[in-house]
Amino acid sequence: MIKIRITLESKEDVIREILVNPENNLEYLHQIIIKNLKLDEFEMASFYITDSNLDLGEEIPLFDTSEKEEEVITMKNMPISSVLYSEDSKLIYIYDFMNMWRFFVEYLESSEETTEKCTHKVGEIPEEAPNLKFEVECQEDVESYEDT
């Protein structure tokens, strides 16, 4: 088992620490998050691999919604152990794309426990999603074009 911490990005503290089998897939972790935070199971969600600064990397969606012919990595075919395996391992979990609930998911430690369970709980989910500001750094200047 591994212990992970799930933290809602909000003014209020909403934290869950959970023991989970790392051989399960991210879809299973998604279901554990939904259950422990009492979220609606019918909303879309994605995990994002991050670097040490929590900059978003590769998206791992719940379902493949792309029109690409090649196989897209989804939660179902990504083991938890491939993305959460050390103290440097962190994910961002976006739930409900209309309201953009954002959670930080981080590896805490390996555990000898044999039962999956919530080991620590702080706070409850607010009724409305936190109003987050997403900032994007521009790498290049954008030229403006005028209609002729």
Each PLM stretch: what is its role?
Residues 1-148:
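Short linear regulatory motifs enriched in tryptophan with gly/pro/ser
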